[in-house]
Amino acid sequence: MEKDPFKEYLRESEPDKAHKGYAWSTAIGLQAVDGLKPSKYLIDTAIQNIEGKITMKEAQTLIDSYYEERPVHLSDDERTEEADKVSSRIAEILSETAFSFSPNEYISIHRKLFQGIYKHAGKIRDYNITKKEWVLDGATVMYGSASELRATLEYDFSQEKDFSYKGLLLYVCHKHKATVRLRDIYVEYS
């Protein structure tokens, strides 16, 4: 019998407990940056996943079912639903090892995070935006021009791909990372 040429390729599996804890903590923390707070239900579901009682897919199914069974009418509850769904999606993305550093991946991640929450999830906006950020004490963030977003994305990704971190001191790496402009581009905001 001939050797299976695909045997060396292993199907990605659930990460270990520590990595799951990191993924959920990061996901919830990223929501807090936008002033969103997850529900107790999400926290309990995340703990079940971290402890290995349910898979990441099962956690997402539980979160989705939870909101299908109890339609939301209040704006605070809508934001909690967003926090829960996006947190579970961030945790899933952080648990995956597959990744391509490209504009298409960036847009795809946006679509995965906000699908079913914002109608323009994963689409490059065709209008200019501004937003006052509480993390900047109310200062307005300057976002890229809608007419140039695709070109700006491609340029920024190429610049980052060409940058070498080899041999740099940690503070220089942090300084460079602080100048990466992807958040300024902001694919879509509803």
Show which residues each predicted segment covers.
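FIC/Doc superfamily catalytic core
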Residues: M1-Y189
